[in-house]
């Protein structure tokens, strides 16, 4: 039993260092993209879609920037990097919220999008597959993309369904 415990502990540390190196690489890529202006251009590309998903958020409000950055980080499979951006986005959305005790429409939509987790490049899963010597660590990309696209579409549809249901009842 002791041998298994120490072997598992060693493997956990090795796996964590492997995942950290992948995270550091992608965070570095995000910084390069930020300094080169690529993030700003991508943000402009996504803003029309994001503005439609969050119509109550003014286009130049800081919340919009955090929302777009969070979605982009999640899309690249950088969940750990997306978390602080998501927290900042929620803080900004709370400032915009007139009723502080209840989540706003934008807060609910943002939560639904984050929960669905649209991912183009599942970096963490690829890293784990590399660690365990997978013959093709990237073969997970296609199924992950399909599953997360379906989940994101479902999240948006369900979010809109309940929003319009509340509007018809006069709750919002």
Model-derived features: positions:
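Membrane-embedded alpha-helical segments and adjacent helix-loop junctions characteristic
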Residues: 2-92
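Alpha-helical transmembrane segments and their lipid-water interface positions
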Residues: 17-22, 121-123, 155-159
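Membrane-interfacial segments
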Residues: 33, 37, 41, 97, ...
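Hydrophobic alpha-helical transmembrane segments
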Residues: 67, 111, 141-145
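Mid-bilayer segments of alpha-helical transmembrane spans in multi-pass integral membrane proteins
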Residues: 71, 75-80, 114-123, 148, ...
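Hydrophobic transmembrane alpha-helices that form the pore/transport pathway of multi-pass ion
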Residues: 71-113, 128-134
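Juxtamembrane and boundary regions of transmembrane helices in multi-pass small-molecule transporters
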Residues: 100, 140-172
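Membrane-embedded transport cores of multi-pass solute transporters
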Residues: 120-140
């Amino acid at each position: 039993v002791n041998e298994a415990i120490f072997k598992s502990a060693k493997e956990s540390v090795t796996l964590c260092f492997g995942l950290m190196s992948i995270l550091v690489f992608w965070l570095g890529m995000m910084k390069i993209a930020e300094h080169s202006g690529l993030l700003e251009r991508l943000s402009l590309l996504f803003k029309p879609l994001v503005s439609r998903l969050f119509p109550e958020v003014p286009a130049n409000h800081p919340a919009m920037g955090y929302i777009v950055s969070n979605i982009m980080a999640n899309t690249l499979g950088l969940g750990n990097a997306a978390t602080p951006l998501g927290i900042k986005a929620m803080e900004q959305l709370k400032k915009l919220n007139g009723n502080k005790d209840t989540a706003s429409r934008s807060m609910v939509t943002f939560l639904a999008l984050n929960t669905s987790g649209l991912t183009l490049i599942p970096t963490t899963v690829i890293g784990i597959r590399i660690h365990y010597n997978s013959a093709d660590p990237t073969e997970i990309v296609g199924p992950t993309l399909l599953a997360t696209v379906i989940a994101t579409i479902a999240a948006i549809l369900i979010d809109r369904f309940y929003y319009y249901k509340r509007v018809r009842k006069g709750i919002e």
